[in-house]
């Protein structure tokens, strides 16, 4: 049986150096990351043509058509002709990620792409392998992300990678990551393609990798069933048959567990009128370092207490801070120091 979709894990193309070392955003955009399309996608396009397959990939990429000196956690699809036919940006970040998001420059993003859901969660519609939506890692912590793709027509959702402890929490293989992806599939009647990254090297010259992900790559059917799963945290492959016609028949005739058909949308329309995380944070300023972004998250938590959404614990404190007060954070010189240290660490 021919392979029609190959899905790579997050980090396979551009890694995680920016977030591990809290690099200045502009420096990382210029020094580390890529353009889509670009020379990397040309190489992948050659492979797509050779094997007559679609390739789905995550990377950190610049979007110069939107804003200079910004990079986004980017999902893209290459078709069997070797062309980039889909590109989307991650909207929800892990608290240590340094990427910009469409929400962080909301006004500019709307100016470029419009303000509909399709501007933030686009779906690639094909004649041969169904409709593909793409999110990444932390995006999948929010049920709304996959629901948005579903409303836009998605039948297959690519959600690469998650990290420890989410992949090994609880007693079941795959931890809460597996639970989330089975839930996404069941609630929305979509396939979930969920490859996880293998061991990560901090630099091209590193001798030893780190296991940050915990493995557990898997594919889930539109009924929420695990079709293929590997518990390994090494570089692995999982595979399954994606039956788009079966999914479409299920949606057409099932009156019991085809949930989207009778969603009472009017009941929920007021839930999101009041914002939680502020938009346009980095419209004028460079995306901030970890310690500054932590203060934004703490402010969001306080707002949920103030509006009565959450109840405060009996004992409460701010928690550990990333840097002591007065620490200037990471800068361009420290980045050069890090690069020199890599060379020293790996000398024979």
Model regions and ranges:
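N-terminal active-site segment of His-dependent metallophosphoesterases
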Residues: 1-5, 14, 158
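Short beta-strand segments at enzyme active-site cores
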Residues: 2-10, 54-59, 193-194
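Metal-dependent catalytic neighborhoods of phosphoester/phosphodiester hydrolases
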Residues: 12-29, 67-71
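Feature marks short, surface-exposed loop/turn motifs that line or immediately flank catalytic pockets
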Residues: 12-15, 165, 246
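Active-site catalytic loop in hydrolytic enzyme cores
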Residues: 33, 42, 46, 62-183, ...
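CN hydrolase (nitrilase-like) catalytic-core segments centered on the catalytic cysteine
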Residues: 33-56, 131, 136-239, 341-347
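Short beta-strand scaffold segments in enzyme catalytic cores
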Residues: 57-58, 73-77, 122-124, 217-219, ...
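C-terminal beta-strand edge segments of enzyme domains
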Residues: 187-191, 196-348
